[in-house]
A protein has these predicted regions:
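Short, surface-exposed "cap/lid" segments of acyl-processing enzymes
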Residues: 1-49
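Alpha/beta-hydrolase active-site loop
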Residues: 65-85
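Short beta-strand immediately N-terminal to the catalytic nucleophile in serine-hydrolase-like folds
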Residues: 93-95, 118, 139
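Gly/Ala-rich beta-loop-alpha elbow adjacent to hydrolase catalytic centers
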Residues: 94-99, 103
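A conserved short beta-strand
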Residues: 111-122
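Short beta-strand/loop motif that positions the catalytic acidic residue
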Residues: 132, 137-144
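Conserved alpha/beta-hydrolase "acid-adjacent" motif
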Residues: 145-151
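C-terminal catalytic histidine-bearing segment of alpha/beta-hydrolase fold enzymes
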Residues: 153, 160-203
Length: 203
C-alpha cells in the first residue's frame, strides 16, 4: 500500500532510532533498533492522519563512533529535507536511546519545537544543546541497565532550571528496549505528538 505524504501538514515528526556507541556496521531497516520504532510511527499516522507528516530517519552506520558523531550527518539531512519540503512547519523529534542523543543535538535548531527522548543515551550533557524554545519530554525505565535514568532526570532538572518546558516521566520497572509497559510508552508518545500539534496550530 502506498502511503502519500500530506500536502500541508501542521506538524512534522522525525523518528530517530537507536544504535550503539561504536560500530561501522551498515544501518539496515530491519535491525531491532529500527523495528522498535515502527509502531510509534504507525500509531502517530493512524491517530493524526494528514495533520502530521512522519519520517523514519535512517543512518548510514549503526554506531555513534566517538567524535565522528556518525548519525548526525544523516539526521541533519533529514531535518533539512523536511523543513525544505514543508517550510514554516514546526518539527517534533522522537528518539530512542542513541536517537535521544541525536535528538538533543538536533534540538539546537530553531525549526525544532519539541523533543521526546525515550530512554535516551545522553552523554557529556547533550541536553545543554537544546534551545530554550523546545518543549522536552523524557521517559526512562527505572530498570534500564543500558542507559541511565538518573542522568536523564538530571538533564531534565537542568533544563527546568533554565526555564525550558521540560518533563521527566519515570517508567517503574521499565527496561531499555521498551518491550514492557508498551501502552505507557506508546500512550505518552501519542500525547506528546498531540500536544505538539496543538502548539503548532496556535503559533
Amino acid at each position: 500500500m502506498l502511503l502519500r505524504a500530506p500536502s500541508s501538514p501542521a506538524l512534522a515528526v522525525l523518528v530517530l532510532p537507536g544504535g550503539t556507541d561504536s560500530s561501522y556496521k551498515p544501518f539496515i531497516p530491519l535491525q531491532p533498533s529500527a523495528l522498535r520504532m515502527y509502531p510509534f510511527s504507525a500509531s502517530i499516522r493512524a491517530r493524526f492522519g494528514s495533520s502530521v507528516v512522519v519520517r523514519d530517519v535512517r543512518y548510514r552506520v549503526y554506531g555513534w563512533n566517538g567524535q565522528q558523531n556518525s548519525p548526525m550527518l544523516y539526521a541533519r539531512k533529514a531535518l533539512d529535507d523536511i523543513t525544505a519540503r514543508y517550510p514554516g512547519v514546526p518539527v517534533a523529534l522522537i528518539g530512542h536511546s542513541m536517537g535521544g542523543r541525536v535528538g538533543a543535538q538536533l534540538a539546537a535548531e530553531r525549526s525544532v519545537g519539541s523533543l521526546l527522548a525515550l530512554a535516551p543515551w545522553w552523554q557529556f550533557a547533550d541536553w545543554r544543546r537544546i534551545h530554550d524554545g523546545v518543549r522536552v519530554v523524557a521517559l526512562h525505565g527505572t530498570a534500564d541497565t543500558r542507559t541511565y535514568a538518573h542522568r536523564t532526570e538530571k538533564g531534565i532538572g537542568e533544563l527546568c532550571a533554565r526555564g525550558v518546558d521540560a518533563t521527566y516521566i519515570p517508567i517503574p520497572g521499565g527496561g531499555h528496549p521498551m518491550l514492557d509497559h508498551v501502552l505507557t510508552w506508546q500512550g505518552e508518545a501519542l500525547r506528546f505528538v498531540g500536544r505538539s500539534l496543538d502548539d503548532a496550530r496556535t503559533r
